[in-house]
Amino acid sequence: MPNFQKFETFDKLTTVPCPYAPDCGGCQHIGVPYGHQAQNKINDLSGLFTAAEVAFPKPLKVLSAGPAHLRDRLDFSLQDGRLGLYRTDRHEILDIEVCAQLSPALQGWLSEFRKIQWPFKRGSFRLRVGPEGQRGLWIDLANVDIKTLLDEQNILRSLQQQAFVEIGQRRKVPVWTGNEFKLRDPEHHVWFQSWMNDIPVNLYCQVASFTQPSHTANKIICDVIYDWVKRYKAQRLIEFGSGIGNLTFPALAGAESVLACEIDELSLQGLERSLNELPASMSHLKDRVTIYRRDFQKKLTQDFSQFDGVLANPPRSGLMGFLNPLKSLAPEQRPEFFIYMSCYPESMARDLVTLQECGYRMQEVYIVDQFPQTDHYEVLGLLQREKA
């Protein structure tokens, strides 16, 4: 069993300075001792579970990778020459040169990026640093501004010397043809990393893809998933919301088979590429994964009784109608265990009510504080079906 105690032990008196507090809306608790922040998140989750009449193990535990400098991706905006995040007091961008949330590598990328003089009034950007330190940039502008950027050429040339660039909602890649830039189809590259116990697994995706915010904090999440799955024998696992496979791989390290369900085609292409790129010593594992594309929130065609466990990481809206087929099964036909991960505990609490009605009880729960200095947090819960 992995030892999570080191992540439960942190300096509760630590405070993180920020030159933009209290004007920046990115962080809500800058200056508050870190131990108080952790306790507030415990109180918040306890309150949600209690109000929903969901039974949970006490005391709740917080796993932390640190109070600051965790993020390896940053989403921010351009407004009238200012690059940063929205202010707390009005809908206006606050110009930000440094941020206590950013990893040193990402802070370095932000500092270089800010040297670009943008000829547009508005825009949105994502900066990303990959597991090997590679830099990525996603640019989202109005269509007319994208054309201007392609025609201007110099800014794109400068950016491509520093980073891999994607443009627009369709994540197109600008390619120089010899006399102009053309937008080509999205490309999959290694922008994130999962773990199978202590073995890193490269995840292929786009700069604009959804991932967890931090390489460091994500290792904690993967370790928890691996620890929980391997406790059960003959695990035929069904995963909902697999995305690019961040949770698929730690689950696969302990499971007999995984059916990965996801609606986004680009994400599933990335997962398939990641499976195909496994080292030779692990290549046999890809045959234990089946990929299934479908909107699981609306209609589930899979039979829950064919699986020993469920792994769910739904969007903010929660599982919605996904749990309906579970109710129609006899108790002994339902999967033995259910792992639920969520960054939106309000919808998680609603879903846990249904799972409790289906005979599941929470065995363990962790708050993973990968969003320090903010109200947000990740929750991982392990539920087990009560035996008849």
Swiss-Prot record:
Which InterPro entries does the record cross-reference, listed alphabetically?
A: MeTrfase_TrmA_AS, MeTrfase_TrmA_CS, rRNA_Ade_Mease_Trfase_CS, SAM-dependent_MTases_sf, U5_MeTrfase_fam
| Any one GO molecular function term | 4 iron, 4 sulfur cluster binding
What is the main EC category here?
Answer: transferase
**UniProt keyword annotation of Glycosyltransferase present:** no
The answer to whether keyword Iron-sulfur applies is yes
Source organism's superkingdom?
Answer: Bacteria
Binding of S-adenosyl-L-methionine, residues: 212, 262, 313
Active-site feature positions: 343
EC numbers listed for it are 2.1.1.-
| UniProt binding sites for [4Fe-4S] cluster | 18, 24, 27, 99
Which CDD domains does the annotation name? Answer: AdoMet_MTases (cd02440)
A Gene Ontology annotation in the biological process aspect, one of them, is: rRNA base methylation
Keywords (alphabetical) are:
4Fe-4S, Iron, Iron-sulfur, Metal-binding, Methyltransferase, S-adenosyl-L-methionine, Transferase
Which family is it part of? Belongs to the class I-like SAM-binding methyltransferase superfamily. RNA M5U methyltransferase family.
Protein name from the UniProt record: Uncharacterized RNA methyltransferase Bd2056
